């Protein structure tokens, strides 16, 4: 059954909602276009009513674009394309408002947008901008008055400028322009030109224009506020980081400026910048004036600073941020150096003005280099230069910034940011009175940087070498419980007998560094402290691995030495029975101190640190390296993922840190001789006790005596290489000697000093003799007294004596060779003297193969 035309019309009149929905779907421009038989696009003018029907859809699309896109140009471009269709305008353009050198202007961002335009074709690159001052053109008038302007005929408009038409070969007839405001501030101007279906834009067009521009206004406001927020954030970061660096260097303006400018380079948003430092001398020295007074040279006639100083740049620091970062320091630069040749820095130093140059190549006042500056092909495009002024309002330097990274000219926000930086740096010049207070902090900074450079914490992959939870359980150690980790470690650790960690003759020569890490973990299990003090097993593994990485890869004082000291401490406690005097907590601290005692050792001794004026020597007055090792160990323990003390209570934690302080500082051999007599007194005192149990009970309660014994144990551990079997000790001795010789080389080349014989590789043949002297003077006492103290330690003393015999034999052999050489030289000298005497007494003269005496 079909409906008549009248019935259909009546139904639609009675059901307006259905009619609206039906025709909205069926009569969209796209469907109408598809229905065209000839395939031609529909006439936009005839579809004006349909466009209005589709207005809600268009607005929805714009809102979606605003949500999905963070690109301002892309969103505004879509708005302008839609406006071209709705207004029947030939094209639309976007002009962004900005300020340079205190002068406001409008620059094209999107130009000649048409309904079928592509964003890339309409987006104006920075070097092709059309710029209007506010006193030129209709767009400038709109920005000044902050009101919409509808120009029906540009020929009758006094504000119209044909400048853009001449550049683009276009004829503007009429236009509609409106400002985009953020409060009272102009953000941009949007303009539509040349009505296609009428002589000019109507009031209805103005309403549509404003309606759709609400979306553009909203997005441009967001963009503008985001830009201002970004600028303020950058400014805050610049001031924060420059303040950080300024207060690290308070004695030298050059280093102060360099550190600050280099640190904030990422926030300056430019490709290159240079800092010219001005000579602050107001009066010349007498010997410089004489040549002028004598008429031998002309007086200075160049520009001067506002306070009357001659403008002389004594140094230029050039920061290259494009391509490979580079810093070039040019002392006493010539006037034709590229950074000065334009005359801009001198002008800024003379006038104190901020100069913002949009197009350097076209500037008439300053002559910038037109071609590429270097092999990289870098060109000067735009420049921002400003003075650095101190609190006395003296210009101390000029900072010049080149080429904003996004290609646009520097704007008002860039000027504010750079001025904040230069102003702060200028004021900071007067802060040198705080140098003494900051000196120690400066040294700490240098040391912290050095620590970071050489220390890398155990990462997620490295821990799998010891705790392979991924392979075993398919998850990370952090996701495993302690029982699971314990089972894995039980299988992965070598056990106490594999490498003889209970033995005094232990040798690391057959072990890898990873084996030593595993042995270190095993020692904590053997001490029974893992379960007792609830050490997280993942933390224990990370700690040992990080300790091993904290040791530098040097000849002797490396991770192997650090582990050997800890293993000897473990052996003295367990095999040597010294554990009977100490609690589990104290043994825990002592083994840890052994592991940390030489961490980050540099291969040079304390005396070298002082001679070379190393920051460590300035930071620590005595036991320089030992205090640094202690601080490094504490630094690692302060990290939660490495803190094996994390489950100790406050009193326990204070106690272990106190013991570590004593144990590590005690490895300074300069202190060894101070404690020898006290240790010997304790050993003698132990012999007065017939009952060993009573002695153990007595000493266990004597805190001071226990600390003295512990300090001497650290010395015995540190020197324990001398007590190893000869085949091990002879190799280790060569490693020690090699490291000493390396220090001797440094003293000879860097310090220009003659090293002592022990560190002079030219006297390497004297090593056996030096070893015998070292054993007699330093080592014999400590191991002899420990063997008296506990007979279980006697093997160390016996091997020491055996090694002395070996070194003595080598020393005697060397002495015999030296003596034989000396005797031979003496015989030759006597023989030569005898021949000379015979000649003098009339004896036969020696025959010569080169001359004949007649």
UniProtKB/Swiss-Prot annotation:
Stated consequence of mutating residue 557 to Y: In RP40; autosomal dominant
Name the record gives this protein: Rod cGMP-specific 3',5'-cyclic phosphodiesterase subunit beta
Stated consequence of mutating residue 527 to P: In RP40; autosomal recessive
Functional summary from the UniProt entry: Rod-specific cGMP phosphodiesterase that catalyzes the hydrolysis of 3',5'-cyclic GMP. Necessary for the formation of a functional phosphodiesterase holoenzyme. Involved in retinal circadian rhythm photoentrainment via modulation of UVA and orange light-induced phase-shift of the retina clock. May participate in processes of transmission and amplification of the visual signal.
PANTHER family cross-referenced by the UniProt entry: CYCLIC NUCLEOTIDE PHOSPHODIESTERASE
GO terms under biological process: cAMP-mediated signaling; entrainment of circadian clock by photoperiod; phototransduction, visible light; retina development in camera-type eye; retinal cell apoptotic process; visual perception
Domain PDEase: 481-814
UniProt keyword annotations, A-Z: Acetylation, Cell projection, cGMP, Congenital stationary night blindness, Disease variant, Hydrolase, Lipoprotein, Magnesium, Manganese, Membrane, Metal-binding, Prenylation, Repeat, Retinitis pigmentosa, Sensory transduction, Vision, Zinc
One term under GO cellular component: plasma membrane
GO molecular function per UniProt: 3',5'-cyclic-AMP phosphodiesterase activity; 3',5'-cyclic-GMP phosphodiesterase activity; metal ion binding
Membership in a protein family: Belongs to the cyclic nucleotide phosphodiesterase family.
EC numbers: 3.1.4.35
Record's subcellular location: Membrane; Cell projection, Cilium, Photoreceptor outer segment
Pfam family of the protein (one): GAF
Binding positions (a divalent metal cation 1): 561, 597-598, 718
PROSITE patterns cross-referenced by the UniProt entry: PDEASE_I_1 (PS00126), PDEASE_I_2 (PS51845)
Catalysed transformations (reactions): 3',5'-cyclic GMP + H2O = GMP + H(+)
Native source species: Homo sapiens (Human)
Location of the GAF domain: 71-220, 252-429
PTM-bearing positions, type N-acetylserine: 2
Disease: Retinitis pigmentosa 40: A retinal dystrophy belonging to the group of pigmentary retinopathies. Retinitis pigmentosa is characterized by retinal pigment deposits visible on fundus examination and primary loss of rod photoreceptor cells followed by secondary loss of cone photoreceptors. Patients typically have night vision blindness and loss of midperipheral visual field. As their condition progresses, they lose their far peripheral visual field and eventually central vision as well.
Cofactor: how bound: Binds 2 divalent metal cations per subunit. Site 1 may preferentially bind zinc ions, while site 2 has a preference for magnesium and/or manganese ions.
Recorded superkingdom: Eukaryota
Oligomeric form and interacting partners: Oligomer composed of two catalytic chains (alpha and beta), an inhibitory chain (gamma) and the delta chain.
């Amino acid at each position: 059954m079909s409906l008549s035309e009248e019935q259909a019309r009546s139904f639609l009149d009675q059901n307006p909602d259905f009619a609206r929905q039906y025709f909205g779907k069926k009569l969209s421009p796209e469907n109408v276009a598809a229905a065209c038989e000839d395939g031609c696009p529909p006439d936009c003018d005839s579809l004006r009513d349909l466009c209005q029907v589709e207005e809600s859809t268009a607005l929805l699309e714009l809102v979606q674009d605003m949500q999905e896109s963070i690109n301002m140009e892309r969103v505004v471009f879509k708005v302008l394309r839609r406006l071209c269709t709705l207004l029947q305008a030939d094209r639309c353009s976007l002009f962004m408002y900005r300020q340079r050198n205190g002068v406001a202007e409008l620059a094209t961002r999107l130009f000649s947008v048409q309904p079928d335009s592509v964003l890339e074709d309409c987006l104006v690159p920075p070097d092709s901008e059309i710029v209007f001052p506010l006193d030129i053109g209709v767009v400038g008038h709109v920005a000044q008055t902050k009101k919409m302007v509808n120009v029906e005929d540009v020929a009758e408009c006094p504000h119209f400028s044909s400048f853009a038409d001449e550049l683009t070969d276009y004829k503007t007839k009429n236009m509609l322009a409106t400002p985009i405001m953020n409060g009272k501030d102009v953000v941009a101007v949007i303009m539509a030109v040349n009505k296609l279906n009428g002589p000019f834009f109507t009031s209805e067009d103005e309403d549509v224009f404003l309606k759709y521009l609400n979306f553009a206004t909203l997005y441009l406001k967001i963009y503008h506020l985001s830009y201002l927020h970004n600028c303020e954030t950058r400014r805050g970061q610049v001031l924060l980081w420059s303040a950080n660096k300024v207060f690290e260097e308070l004695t030298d303006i050059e280093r102060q400026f360099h550190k600050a400018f280099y640190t904030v380079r990422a926030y300056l948003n430019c490709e290159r910048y240079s800092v010219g430092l001005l000579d602050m001398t107001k009066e010349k020295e007498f010997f410089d004036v004489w040549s002028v007074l004598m008429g031998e040279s002309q007086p200075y006639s160049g520009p001067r600073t506002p306070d009357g100083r001659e403008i002389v740049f004594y140094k230029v620091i050039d920061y290259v941020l494009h391509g490979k970062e580079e810093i070039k320091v040019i002392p006493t630069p010539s006037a034709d150096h590229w950074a000065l040749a334009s005359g801009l820095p001198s002008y800024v130093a003379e006038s104190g003005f901020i100069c913002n140059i949009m197009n350097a190549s076209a500037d008439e006042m300053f002559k910038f280099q037109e071609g590429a500056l270097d092999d990289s092909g870098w060109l000067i495009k735009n420049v921002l230069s400003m003075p650095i002024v101190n609190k006395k309002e003296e210009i101390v330097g000029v900072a010049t910034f080149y080429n904003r990274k996004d290609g646009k000219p520097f704007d008002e926000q860039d000027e504010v940011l750079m001025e904040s930086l230069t102003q702060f740096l200028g004021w900071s010049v007067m802060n040198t009175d705080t140098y003494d207070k900051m000196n120690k902090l400066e040294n700490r900074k240098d040391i912290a940087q050095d620590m970071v450079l050489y220390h890398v914490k155990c990462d997620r992959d490295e821990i799998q070498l010891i705790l392979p939870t991924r392979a075993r359980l398919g998850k990370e150690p952090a996701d495993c419980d302690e029982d699971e980790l314990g089972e894995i470690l039980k299988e992965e650790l070598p056990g106490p007998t594999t490498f003889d960690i209970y033995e005094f003759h232990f040798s690391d020569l057959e072990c890898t560094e990873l084996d030593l890490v595993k042995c270190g973990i095993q020692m904590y299990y053997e001490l029974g402290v893992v379960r007792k003090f609830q050490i997280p097993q993942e933390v224990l593994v990370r700690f040992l691995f990080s300790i091993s990485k904290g040791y530098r890869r040097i000849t002797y004082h490396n991770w192997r030495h650090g582990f050997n000291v800890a293993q000897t401490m473990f052996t003295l406690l367990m095999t040597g029975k010294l554990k009977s005097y100490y609690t589990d907590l104290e043994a825990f601290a002592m083994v840890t101190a052994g592991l940390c005692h030489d961490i980050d050792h540099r291969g040079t001794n304390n005396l070298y640190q002082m001679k070379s004026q190393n920051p460590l020597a300035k930071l620590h007055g005595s036991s320089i390296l030992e205090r640094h090792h202690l601080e490094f160990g504490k630094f690692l323990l302060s990290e939660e993922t490495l803190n094996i003390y994390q489950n100790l209570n406050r009193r326990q934690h204070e106690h272990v840190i106190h013991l570590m302080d004593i144990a590590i500082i005690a490895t300074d051999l300069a202190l060894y001789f101070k404690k020898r007599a006290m240790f010997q007194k304790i050993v003698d005192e132990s012999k007065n006790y017939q009952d060993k149990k009573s002695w153990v009970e007595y000493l266990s309660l004597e805190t001071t005596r226990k600390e003295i014994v512990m300090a001497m144990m650290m010395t015995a551990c540190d020197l324990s290489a001398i007590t190893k079997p000869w085949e091990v000790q002879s190799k280790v001795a060569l490693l020690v000697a090699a490291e000493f010789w390396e220090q001797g080389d440094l003293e000879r080349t860097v310090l220009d000093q003659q090293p002592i014989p022990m560190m002079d590789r030219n006297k390497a043949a004297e090593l056996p003799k030096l070893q015998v002297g070292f054993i007699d003077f330093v080592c014999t006492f400590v191991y002899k007294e420990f063997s008296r103290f506990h007979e279980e330690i006697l093997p160390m003393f016996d091997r020491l004596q055996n090694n002395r015999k070996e070194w003595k034999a080598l020393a005697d052999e060397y002495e015999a060779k030296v003596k034989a050489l000396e005797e031979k030289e003496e015989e030759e000298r006597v023989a030569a003297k005898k021949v000379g005497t015979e000649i003098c007494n009339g004896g036969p003269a020696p025959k010569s193969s080169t001359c004949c005496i007649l």
